[in-house]
Amino acid sequence: MSKIAFMFPGQGSYEAGMGREIAEAVPEAMEVYEAGSEAAGIDLKELCFNAPAEAMLDTKVQQPALVATSLAINQAIRSRGIAPDYVVGHSVGEFAALGAAESIGIPEAIGLVRERGLAMAEAARQHPGSMAAILGLADEVVESLCRKIQNVWPANYNCPGQIVVSGEDDAVGECCTEAEREGARRAVRLRVSGAFHSPLVARAADRLRPAVEKIQFSDPRAAFMSTVTAKLEDASRYRELLIEQLTAPVRFTQAARELAGRGVTVFVEVGPGNVLSGLLKRIDRSVRTVSVSNMSELRELEETLA
């Protein structure tokens, strides 16, 4: 019997009006925004449904808005009787994954992400940096460049031939230049406010720790694939992993391959956009991907699994 994994996107997968159609059609989805707004202390319905996309450039609001939208869409999918065997999240998407797997409550997940966004924004102000996507080089080549240049690190293993690096601005610039000399197809600076998933934001991990340590994690109803370790992890590890992920690279490629190796044949992207689905097609063409961000795509998912 085929297995299903729900994938939850990370920062950058936002869009104006995200989640509105599903929330207005499915009461369980609207309840997520209402509970999340109270937990985060911001009006997530107004932010997601009506604010321009530019409002999401602030990581402090983008993170809770994105996770709330992913969890609202998850509730809509679950209302159709569809449940995953596995969950996996890209960066902040791990908080949505754990909420969807019912290891933590939805308000707790969104409240934690609000604190995470505040912590990351503060760390980025204290120790500025940047990120860039290196396209068309092997992982080993990019890793070697980072070791040689210093103060720049691999941050996201997105798919074969696409690694994001993170670090001090000059070091990231040098890495881009050297990557192109090594034959990279492109080196693209990302529109982010800090050097996330690098040691430069270690203070964010320190600030987030007390909030994470207050949370009681239950055994998940769907197996949790960590993108910190690219392994299945149990509830005893979640606190440390959610703190560690702030400074550790996102091993999405490795995690997706591990899930495919465990028999997952359908990957469902739960959240705005289809970034992860696009990456999956470059990781393993034998699996099926479905993105769900509106009612039409929800119906498509039902047809796919019928």
Regions found by a protein language model. Name each.
Residues 28, 65-69, 171, 207, ...:
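Charged catalytic carboxylate motif
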Residues 11-14, 38-40, 52, 101-249:
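Alpha/beta catalytic cores of group-transfer enzymes, especially the acyltransferase/condensing modules
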Residues 301-306:
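Short amphipathic alpha-helix with an adjacent loop that forms part of the alpha/beta core around
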Residues 2-141, 186, 190, 266-299:
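FabD-like malonyl-/acyl-CoA
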Residues 247-264:
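A short, acidic, amphipathic alpha-helical segment used as a generic capping/interface helix at domain edges
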Residues 78, 180, 260-263:
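Non-catalytic positions within long, well-ordered alpha-helices that form the structural scaffold/packing
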